[in-house]
Each structure stands twice: as structure tokens, then as C-alpha cells.
């Protein structure tokens, strides 16, 4: 759907039955303005056009059914009980597997792990360890080839069989726009730059590692974001963890969303600033912390904080939720705080022009003080960037550890980013970038709706390409991953401690490279595995009212 001149890209034409395509009227009723609807255990965060928002904002987090929560705790209890029993049997050398016992020569060594972490790794994680770190031997595109491996010691070690599992549908990579491939203009350009510049720079930007390609990339990133200047880094994680300490320090206050990425958490801790946590995407919680910070100031001295920095993400990679950016910006302006926005997952994946969550909401980039993002996902490359005022970027060039001490970004990687970014911007003379953005949006809505029709509990925003499917029980984490691989579907499964103990999940990442046939194949297998493992917990199954084309459907919501 192309936006009308002077209109909002999210507005859809009205149907004869009163419903709006992919938009304002959903499930047979009109969304109320800026409301939270909680009906029979389902939590909807919905926002109608008007006020701060220029487009509908719909997120769903269905509450865990009570019986499922109880059975999940019972499952962990049984696993813990048998874990202690196995430790007892190992102590008396009755247990056959001795890999979990400590070596005699290391008995007197200082423990490397906390007791519970050690216990959890030995007795719970090892049971399902085969679901992670699976080696692939192909481009991480819509399909991948996986090297088959077997374990003969209960997942403590693996041996390759020599077989290759070919054509596995890839539902786990962050290849949002499909640029992770080995053919096409991006790869040809990167190959030419590799011939001219080589693979590495072997120096920092401060010394002799500042190439003309670095300058070209940073100017392009600034133009793409709509900011005065930008700086690029060779590692996305370090872009957060090494730059936040340069922005804030002792006497400053960081207000961080409780579900922020580990790189943001590490950067906040390294900074030495005081850290306060607000509830995920909860503006009342954030505003209370802002009020308290201004009223009470620093602990003991009651002096005003030197800076107040709000840390949020565009798309939260475990929840599939989108930051309520218009409200965050309104609070930031009201209380004179600074805003640090991590667009690692949202840049390229959201917005009519692929410019991230700022573009998605139709906001002014100047309202965000620090715009951070990575090239590892939508651009099919590596590294990260920070954009903002020229004064900010000049300051970071001399004070950021990642800028001063890190080796410069590889030339062919930079060329991959430059070419893919120009494609997204339409500067390559084609409409490929725009088509990829539109295809990703259609794939996202289609995949989410089909899963909800099947009866799964799905978290997150309806426009988020990150789609968490709730598994809950620990035994179903490993079972789901293995059953999907048997059916040639590669998925990511996640459990405690990466998620709350009763909120284990599978996480699907949609891509513009996925065709309807690929998605339908994956959905068919997910449906079968869902029945096999009894994963269809939702009491709010969506039922299609009309025959469904690929990109537009109306639904009614039924309660089982």
C-alpha cells in the first residue's frame, strides 16, 4: 500500500463491511483512543489515530493460563528434584555419565560459577543443549544448510556426522530485508572493494585506518537517518557498551527499560551512573521515575542530577514489542531529559521508508538525542552506528573507547552497507528496496495472523517482524526445536534465564526473502508440531471472516 500524498502510510481504504485493511477497525470493533484493554486474561495495548500517535498501535500480551503456569513450575520442580538426585548418584559414582563431575586435580580450585548457575547448566541446560549453536554451512538466507551432529555423552560434546541437512527454512536469522545473500549488486560491489582495499585495515580510525569509505558511509548514514552527523563502529554490541560510558558518568541518572538488551545494560553499568529501571513500555512507570529524579535529586546530597538519560529500544528482540516512542519523546521534552534510542532491530525493518521506529511513527529525528543502530540485521553486514548532532559525534570521536581503540570497519563490509542502504533509499535506480520493505510488512502481518488463527499465544506488536510463540514448559523447549528441525524448519528457542522462568518461547524472525510458499510450509509444520506438543494455549483464537488473500484479511475474535 503506497501512502497518499499528504497522508499517513498506515491508513487503509475502507471496506464495504466497515473494516479497514490491516488497520484501524480490528476484530469487529473500533479501537478506543489511547486505551489498554484487558479481557479474560488478554492484554491489548491499543492506540487510535489522534493525539501523539499518527497511526494505530496494537500490541498483545496474552496472560499465561493459570493451569499452564502451575504445570510449568511443576516441570521445573521435577527437573530440579531429579537434578539433585543425579548429583547424589554422581557423588557415589552410580551415575553412568561422569562428565558433570569435577576433576580430581581441580577439587581445590576456586569455583567459576555460582552454585545455582552451575546446577542449572549441568542438569537442565545440558538436556536441551543440542538446540543451540547449530553450525550452518551456507548463506543465512531464506533457506540454510545445517551440518548434522550427534552427541554420545548426553550433549556434553558433539561430533559431526559428515551429513548436510539441506534446504532448511530459516526462521531464526535477523535477515529482515533479505540482503544476506551471495549474489546481486551488494555482493558484487563488496567483491570489487575487497580487490581494491583488502579485507582489513589493521589500524584504528585515529591512526592510519580512516579510509575514504568510512567517510562516505558516515555521510550516507547521516543522510539516511535525517541527522546532522553519524559515526560508525565495527561491532554492534560495542556501539552500546562502549559509548554509553562516554555520555554519562558519576552524578548522572540512567532510566532503562526492564527488557533492554545486554549491551545497553553493560554500557549503563560501566558508566558509573545511577541506574533506575522502569516497567517495560510503561509510560506511567517512566514518568514516576522522572518526577522522583527531579524532586529528590541525587541520594544523600539531594543535588540535581547532571544528566538524565532514557534508554529504550525500537523493537525489543525477545518480546516483539515496539517502543511507545511518541510518549517517550513527550516525557523527555516535559522533564528535560535526554533520549538514547537503540534501533538495532527496527532500522530497515520498520517505517514506510525503512528508517526505523522514528519513521514508523512519523516523528522528527531531531527529537531523539542519540540514535543508535546496527548493520548486522537489515543490512546483512556487521557493525553499528550512532547519529545525532554534530557536536555529539565530534565528542564521541575523541571520548568513545570504541572509536579510539577499536580497529576500523572492514572495507568490503562497509561497501555491503553502502550498497544496501542506497538500495533502501532508492538511490540505486531501482525500486527493490521499497519492495523489500513492503514485502517484509506483508509477511509479518500474514505470519502473525495465521499463528493466532491456529490458537498459539503470540507476543508483540502486529507490525513487528520478531514473533515470539509461547512454549512455557521446559520440556517443550527442546521438543519444539527438535521437531521443527526434523521437518526442515530452523527455529530459535529461548528459555530461562534469557526469559522469565515461566515464559519460555520460540522466536521467529520474518524476512522479505520469505515467499508465501515458504511461510505456508513453515506454518503447516508449526501447526502440526503445535498439535503434537499441545502448544495452542490461546483463548482468543482469530477466525477469518472472508477468504484471505495474502496481504489483507478481516477477523473476528472468539474466546474458547
UniProtKB/Swiss-Prot annotation:
This is Serine palmitoyltransferase 2. Its main location: endoplasmic reticulum. GO terms for molecular function: pyridoxal phosphate binding; serine C-palmitoyltransferase activity. The chain crosses the membrane at residues 65-85. Keywords: Acyltransferase, Endoplasmic reticulum, Lipid metabolism, Membrane, Pyridoxal phosphate, Sphingolipid metabolism, Transferase, Transmembrane, Transmembrane helix. It comes from the Eukaryota. It is an enzyme of class 2 (transferase). Disruption phenotype: Adipocyte-specific knockout mice have reduced adipose tissue mass and develop hepatosteatosis with insulin resistance and hyperglycemia. The modification N6-(pyridoxal phosphate)lysine is found at residue 377. GO terms for cellular component: endoplasmic reticulum membrane; mitochondrion; serine palmitoyltransferase complex. SPT complex catalytic activity is negatively regulated by ORMDL proteins, including ORMDL3, in the presence of ceramides. This mechanism allows to maintain ceramide levels at sufficient concentrations for the production of complex sphingolipids, but which prevents the accumulation of ceramides to levels that trigger apoptosis. Component of the serine palmitoyltransferase multisubunit enzyme (SPT) that catalyzes the initial and rate-limiting step in sphingolipid biosynthesis by condensing L-serine and activated acyl-CoA (most commonly palmitoyl-CoA) to form long-chain bases. The SPT complex is composed of SPTLC1, SPTLC2 or SPTLC3 and SPTSSA or SPTSSB. Within this complex, the heterodimer consisting of SPTLC1 and SPTLC2/SPTLC3 forms the catalytic core. The composition of the serine palmitoyltransferase (SPT) complex determines the substrate preference. It is a single-pass membrane protein.
Amino acid at each position: 500500500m503506497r501512502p497518499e500524498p499528504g497522508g499517513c502510510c498506515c491508513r487503509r481504504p475502507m471496506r464495504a463491511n466497515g473494516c479497514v485493511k490491516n488497520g484501524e477497525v480490528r476484530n469487529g470493533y473500533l479501537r478506543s483512543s489511547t486505551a489498554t484493554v484487558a479481557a479474560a486474561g488478554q492484554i491489548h495495548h491499543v492506540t487510535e489515530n489522534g493525539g501523539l500517535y499518527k497511526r494505530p498501535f496494537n500490541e498483545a500480551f496474552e496472560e499465561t493460563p493459570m493451569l499452564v503456569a502451575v504445570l510449568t513450575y511443576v516441570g521445573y520442580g521435577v527437573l530440579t528434584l531429579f537434578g539433585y538426585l543425579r548429583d547424589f548418584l554422581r557423588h557415589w559414582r552410580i551415575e553412568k555419565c561422569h562428565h558433570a563431575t569435577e576433576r580430581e586435580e581441580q577439587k581445590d580450585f576456586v569455583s567459576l560459577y555460582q552454585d545455582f548457575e552451575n546446577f542449572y547448566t549441568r542438569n537442565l541446560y545440558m538436556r536441551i543443549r543440542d538446540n543451540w549453536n547449530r553450525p550452518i554451512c551456507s548463506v543465512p538466507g531464506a533457506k540454510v544448510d545445517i551440518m548434522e551432529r550427534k552427541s554420545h555423552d548426553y550433549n556434553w560434546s558433539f561430533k559431526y556426522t559428515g551429513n548436510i541437512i539441506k534446504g532448511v527454512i530459516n526462521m531464526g536469522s535477523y535477515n529482515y530485508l533479505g540482503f544476506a545473500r551471495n549474489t546481486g549488486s551488494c555482493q558484487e560491489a563488496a567483491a570489487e572493494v575487497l580487490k581494491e582495499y583488502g579485507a582489513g585495515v589493521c589500524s584504528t580510525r585515529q591512526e592510519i585506518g580512516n579510509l575514504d569509505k568510512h567517510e562516505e558511509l558516515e555521510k550516507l548514514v547521516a543522510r539516511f537517518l535525517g541527522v546532522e552527523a553519524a559515526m560508525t563502529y565495527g561491532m554492534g554490541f560495542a556501539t552500546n557498551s562502549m559509548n554509553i560510558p562516554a555520555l554519562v558518568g558519576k552524578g548522572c541518572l540512567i532510566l532503562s527499560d526492564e527488557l533492554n538488551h545486554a549491551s545497553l545494560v553493560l554500557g549503563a553499568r560501566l558508566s558509573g551512573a545511577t541506574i533506575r529501571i522502569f516497567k517495560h513500555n510503561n509510560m506511567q512507570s517512566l514518568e514516576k521515575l522522572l518526577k522522583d529524579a527531579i524532586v529528590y535529586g541525587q541520594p544523600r546530597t539531594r543535588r540535581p542530577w547532571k544528566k538524565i538519560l532514557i534508554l529504550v529500544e525500537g523493537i525489543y528482540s525477545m518480546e516483539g514489542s515496539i517502543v511507545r516512542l511518541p510518549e517517550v519523546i513527550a516525557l523527555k521534552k516535559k522533564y528535560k531529559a535526554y533520549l538514547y534510542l537503540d534501533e538495532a532491530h527496527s532500522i530497515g525493518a520498520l517505517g514506510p521508508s525503512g528508517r526505523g521506529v522514528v519513521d514508523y511513527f512519523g516523528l522528527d529525528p531531531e527529537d531523539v538525542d542519540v540514535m543508535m543502530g546496527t548493520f548486522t540485521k537489515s543490512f546483512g553486514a556487521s557493525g553499528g552506528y550512532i547519529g545525532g548532532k554534530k557536536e555529539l559525534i565530534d565528542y564521541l570521536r575523541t571520548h568513545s573507547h570504541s572509536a579510539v581503540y577499536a580497529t576500523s570497519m572492514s572495507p568490503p563490509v562497509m561497501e555491503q552497507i553502502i550498497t544496501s542502504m542506497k538500495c533502501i533509499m532508492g538511490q540505486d535506480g531501482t525500486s527493490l528496496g521499497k519492495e523489500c520493505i513492503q514485502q517484509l510488512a506483508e509477511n509479518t502481518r500474514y505470519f502473525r495472523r495465521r499463528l493466532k488463527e491456529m490458537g498459539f499465544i503470540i507476543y508483540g506488536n502486529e507490525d513487528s517482524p520478531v514473533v515470539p510463540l509461547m512454549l512455557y514448559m521446559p520440556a517443550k523447549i527442546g521438543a519444539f526445536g527438535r521437531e521443527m528441525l526434523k521437518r526442515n524448519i530452523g527455529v530459535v528457542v529461548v528459555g530461562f534465564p534469557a526469559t522469565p522462568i515461566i515464559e519460555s518461547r520460540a522466536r521467529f524472525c520474518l524476512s522479505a526473502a520469505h515467499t508465501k510458499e515458504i511461510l505456508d510450509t513453515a506454518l503447516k509444520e508449526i501447526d502440526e508440531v503445535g498439535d503434537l506438543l499441545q502448544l495452542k494455549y490461546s483463548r482468543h483464537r482469530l477466525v477469518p471472516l472472508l477468504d484471505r488473500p495474502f496481504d489483507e484479511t478481516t477477523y473476528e475474535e472468539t474466546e474458547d
